[in-house]
């Protein structure tokens, strides 16, 4: 199986907008037609939780990270995210959980800013985050939320990034985010950013 090698360091570049779009994970899209441009009105996504089916810590690196080998699996528990465009150049976050930050300390904010800065997006986005995945439970809630926002921002502003390109960028947010973009079943190595997709497992209760 071909491994997806994701580098932590990458160069930012400006890419022109394109009609190509990445749709994985999108539940519902509302659009309005204005002249020849299609503008996204609202995008709703599911941010799937994940569990580790096995974990082997192989060594501690000089940068403080641990090298690992583990099987990661998406499960049918998810947060709900709604993205709405804003005319003003800002990122606005709201959530149903009072103790979560709604500024740049939230991973969904960081995810949106990552792409919007790189592609010099001049408008804004509102992120409505409905949390159902337990926080700080090792189920990848924050990472999955960030991954879903990357997918949504890519679609909303028609940035044309492929899944691999989203995964390459997402490692700058967190080691688990690339898997949350990929989803499914995968062998994770390195600090979790080197992913080998595996065959889907039979459905079961966790």
Task: Describe each PLM feature range.
Residues 108, 137-165, 179:
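DPxDG-like acidic metal-binding loop motif
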Residues 117-128, 152-170:
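Phosphate-handling active-site elements
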Residues 13-16:
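Short hydrophobic alpha-helical segments enriched in small aliphatic residues
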Residues 1-5, 27:
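Methionine residue identity
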Residues 29-91:
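N-terminal, positively charged, Ser/Thr/Ala/Gly-biased leader segments
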Residues 74, 79-115:
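Glycine-rich, flexible beta-strand/loop modules in the N-terminal catalytic cores of phosphate-handling
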Residues 41-46, 52-56, 60-70, 159-206:
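ATP-dependent small-molecule kinase catalytic core of the GHMP/sugar-kinase superfamily
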Residues 103-133:
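Helix-rich "cap/lid" substructures immediately adjacent to catalytic or cofactor-binding pockets
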């Amino acid at each position: 199986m071909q491994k997806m090698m994701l580098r932590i360091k990458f160069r930012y570049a400006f890419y022109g907008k394109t009609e190509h779009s990445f749709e994985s994970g999108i539940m519902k899209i509302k659009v309005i037609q204005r002249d020849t441009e299609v503008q996204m009105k609202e995008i709703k996504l599911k941010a799937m939780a994940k569990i580790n089916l096995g974990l082997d810590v192989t060594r501690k690196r000089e940068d403080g990270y641990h090298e690992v080998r583990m099987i990661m699996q998406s499960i049918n528990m998810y947060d709900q995210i709604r993205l709405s465009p804003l005319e003003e150049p800002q990122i606005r976050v709201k959530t149903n959980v009072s103790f979560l930050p709604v500024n740049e300390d939230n991973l969904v904010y960081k995810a949106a800013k990552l792409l919007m800065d790189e592609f010099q997006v001049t408008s804004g986005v509102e992120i409505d985050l409905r949390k159902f995945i337990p926080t700080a439970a090792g189920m990848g809630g924050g990472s999955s939320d960030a991954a879903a926002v990357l997918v949504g921002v890519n679609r909303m502003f028609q940035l044309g990034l492929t899944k691999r390109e989203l995964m390459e960028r997402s490692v700058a947010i967190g080691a688990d985010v690339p898997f949350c973009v990929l989803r499914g079943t995968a062998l994770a190595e390195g600090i979790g950013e080197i992913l080998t997709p595996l065959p889907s497992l039979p459905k079961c209760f966790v």
